[in-house]
């Protein structure tokens, strides 16, 4: 197949606002209307808002792993804290060593820097092979080197504070928030309560909470064991480390509550460890967030197709999987540059492909313009749930209604059946029981038939069969041509020359003229002969009358 033309829109930061303003001038329209398409086996499964993003925002989380106990309770919690401290050091020291090796690999010499940089990466990978993601992570780690050094200068003050969350701004080039999940626990349980606890109970509570946090740390840094410092931390891992205090950093970086859940689901918020200090048990993580530009008038519509019944067999509609609509323009959307969530689509660039007039007309509601392929087999899932109702091909599967009892039949020539709560309350399909709560109102087109001219061949086997038929037709045509040539070869070429043809034409015209003249003369003679016969008959009759008159006298 030939390459398709496409519209490629890169989205550097300076173009985000310009693109958003341009698209905001276009008239807002409703999404693609799936009601006339459902009965043709084309189902609109949902819409997503289209956003463009670049990963440009960064901030730092300074995780305070070791909490400060109140003075009167330090002795009680000493044993579990010391055991916890030793376990932390054992667990995170390889991570800290790897971070230092990579950061120290930066030198002033360009060529030597590259060699030492790559060597540091490969030396920290267990298998000895550095992937592109690991190189990117190591590059980000080196870029955060100065910020990590600034944080280390403040480590004593960070470790000494009893605050669970506070901003660190002294000498830092980017926003940094110090958080302590364990400090939050200590503050809630011991500092901010008047309840007196005995020493044994304090040790038990602290020990249990520290063990739980160690389990979370082991889960978070499990991938770092095989490849220290080069594996990005997910947003879920960051929340495990920082607890609810993670929201403070995200809010400071400009992530609104309406975007937070969507961004968390997208996986675009990631973190890279940039420092670990075993003396104060300080862990620094650089968090990367995307700069998101929302395109208010642009949405992505997802389409699914069902295997429908046609007079040529089962077929599936030839439509794009995802289309985008801005105003009255509908084009196919390439989602390979996008990350999707339940409600949003985040793309580094917008790439669309124009559709043929036939597909455009089809998606606009003219189902007679839709084309179908016979590539779908009988084992294809012949039904789909849509808003509490079901669209099913009841010729491929048995549509058994349990309430009220009965079998739903599909009319001859009908592509699919639209089944809602008005026709069946409880539906059974291939052993799956569904309780229907939705309905297809009068705006849904029903009883759509697929014409033979709408079904084309696209599968490899079918194309081979059709090509065989074409070859047979061509062979038959060649045989007919050979017969014609053999007959033409028997014709005397001299008789078909130009002068001979002119002579034939002149003689033919002369013959026609003589023929016409002869015909006219013959007609004239016949007419004259008939006139003479009439005259003789009249004379004979008169003579007979005279003879009769004489005889009577």
Curated annotation (Swiss-Prot):
BP GO annotations: fusion of virus membrane with host plasma membrane; symbiont entry into host cell
Residues on the membrane's Cytoplasmic side span: 522-553
Segments of this protein annotated with the region Fusion peptide: 117-141
Cellular component per GO, a single term: viral envelope
User: Which coarse location class applies to the principal site listed for this UniProt protein?
Assistant: virion
What SUPFAM superfamilies does UniProt report for this protein, alphabetically?
Head and neck region of the ectodomain of NDV fusion glycoprotein, Virus ectodomain
Q: State the membrane topology.
A: Single-pass type I membrane protein; Single-pass membrane protein
- Disulfide bonding pattern of the chain: 76-199, 338-347, 362-370
Residues of this chain annotated as glycosylated in UniProt: 85, 191, 366, 447, 471
Q: Which UniProt keywords apply?
A: Cleavage on pair of basic residues, Coiled coil, Disulfide bond, Fusion of virus membrane with host cell membrane, Fusion of virus membrane with host membrane, Glycoprotein, Host cell membrane, Host membrane, Lipoprotein, Membrane, Palmitate, Signal, Transmembrane, Transmembrane helix, Viral envelope protein, Viral penetration into host cytoplasm, Virion, Virus entry into host cell
Residues of the site described as Cleavage: 116-117
Q: Which residues lie on this side of the membrane: Extracellular?
A: 32-500
Q: Which domain of life is it from?
A: Viruses
User: From which residue to which does the signal peptide run?
Assistant: 1-31
Indicate whether Glycoprotein appears among the record's keywords: yes
What is an example of a Pfam family matching this protein? Fusion_gly
- Positions with an attached lipid (S-palmitoyl cysteine) read 523
Query: For this UniProt entry, which segments traverse the membrane?
Result: 501-521
Cellular localisation: Virion membrane; Host cell membrane
Q: Where does the record place a coiled coil?
A: 142-170, 466-491
- Can the keyword Glycoprotein be found in this entry's annotation? yes
Record note on modification: The inactive precursor F0 is glycosylated and proteolytically cleaved into F1 and F2 to be functionally active. The cleavage is mediated by cellular proteases during the transport and maturation of the polypeptide.
Record family assignment: Belongs to the paramyxoviruses fusion glycoprotein family.
Q: What does this chain do?
A: Class I viral fusion protein. Under the current model, the protein has at least 3 conformational states: pre-fusion native state, pre-hairpin intermediate state, and post-fusion hairpin state. During viral and plasma cell membrane fusion, the heptad repeat (HR) regions assume a trimer-of-hairpins structure, positioning the fusion peptide in close proximity to the C-terminal region of the ectodomain. The formation of this structure appears to drive apposition and subsequent fusion of viral and plasma cell membranes.
Quote the subunit structure annotation.
Homotrimer of disulfide-linked F1-F2.
| Protein name according to UniProt | Fusion glycoprotein F0
Q: Which organism is it from?
A: Newcastle disease virus (strain Texas) (NDV)
């Amino acid at each position: 197949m030939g390459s398709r033309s496409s519209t490629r829109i890169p989205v550097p930061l300076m173009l985000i606002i310009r693109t958003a303003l341009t698209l905001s001038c276009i008239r807002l329209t409703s999404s693609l209307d799936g009601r006339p398409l459902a009965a043709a086996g084309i189902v609109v499964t949902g819409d997503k808002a289209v956003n463009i993003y670049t990963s440009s925002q960064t901030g730092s989380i300074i995780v305070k792993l070791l909490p400060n106990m109140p003075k009167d309770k330090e002795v009680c919690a000493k044993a579990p804290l010391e055991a916890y401290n030793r376990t932390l050091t054992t667990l995170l020291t390889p991570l800290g060593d790897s971070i230092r090796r990579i950061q120290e690999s930066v030198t002033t010499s360009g060529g030597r820097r590259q060699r030492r940089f790559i060597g540091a990466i490969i030396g920290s990978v267990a298998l000895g092979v550095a992937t592109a993601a690991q190189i990117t992570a190591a590059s980000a780690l080196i870029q955060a080197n100065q910020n990590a050094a600034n944080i280390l200068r403040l480590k004593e003050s960070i470790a000494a504070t009893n605050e669970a969350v506070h901003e660190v701004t002294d000498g830092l080039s980017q926003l940094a928030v110090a958080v302590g999940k364990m400090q939050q626990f200590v503050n809630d349980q011991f500092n901010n309560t008047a309840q007196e606890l005995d020493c044994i109970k304090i040790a038990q509570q602290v020990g249990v909470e520290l063990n739980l946090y160690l389990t979370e740390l082991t889960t978070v840094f499990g991938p770092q064991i095989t490849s220290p410092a080069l594996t990005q931390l997910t947003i879920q891992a960051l929340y495990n480390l920082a607890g609810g205090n993670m929201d403070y950093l995200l809010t400071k970086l400009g992530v609104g509550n309406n975007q937070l859940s969507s961004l968390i689901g997208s996986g675009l918020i990631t973190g890279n460890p940039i420092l670990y200090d075993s003396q104060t048990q300080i862990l620094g993580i650089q968090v990367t967030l995307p700069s998101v530009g929302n395109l208010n008038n642009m949405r992505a519509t997802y389409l699914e197709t069902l295997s429908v019944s046609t007079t040529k067999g089962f077929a599936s509609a030839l439509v794009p999987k995802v289309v985008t609509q801005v105003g009255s323009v509908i084009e196919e959307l390439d989602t390979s540059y996008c990350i999707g969530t339940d409600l949003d689509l985040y793309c580094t660039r917008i790439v669309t492909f124009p559709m043929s007039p036939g597909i455009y007309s089809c998606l606009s509601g003219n189902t007679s313009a839709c084309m179908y392929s016979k590539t779908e087999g009988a084992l294809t899932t012949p039904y789909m749930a849509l808003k509490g109702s079901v669209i099913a091909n009841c010729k491929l599967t048995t549509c058994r209604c349990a309430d009220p009892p009965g079998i739903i039949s599909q009319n001859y020539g009908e592509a699919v059946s639209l089944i809602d709560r008005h026709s069946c309350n409880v539906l059974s399909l291939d052993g799956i029981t569904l309780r229907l709560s939705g309905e297809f109102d009068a705006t849904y087109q029903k009883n759509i038939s697929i014409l033979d001219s709408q079904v084309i061949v696209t599968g490899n086997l079918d194309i081979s069969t059709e090509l065989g038929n074409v070859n047979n037709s061509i062979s038959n045509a060649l045989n007919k041509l050979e017969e014609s040539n053999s007959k033409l070869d028997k014709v005397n070429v001299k008789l078909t020359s130009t002068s001979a043809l002119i002579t034939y034409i002149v003689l033919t015209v002369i013959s026609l003229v003589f023929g016409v003249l002869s015909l006219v003369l013959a007609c004239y003679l016949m007419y004259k002969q008939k006139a003479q016969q009439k005259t003789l008959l009249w004379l004979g009759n008169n003579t007979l009358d005279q003879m009769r008159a004489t005889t009577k006298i």
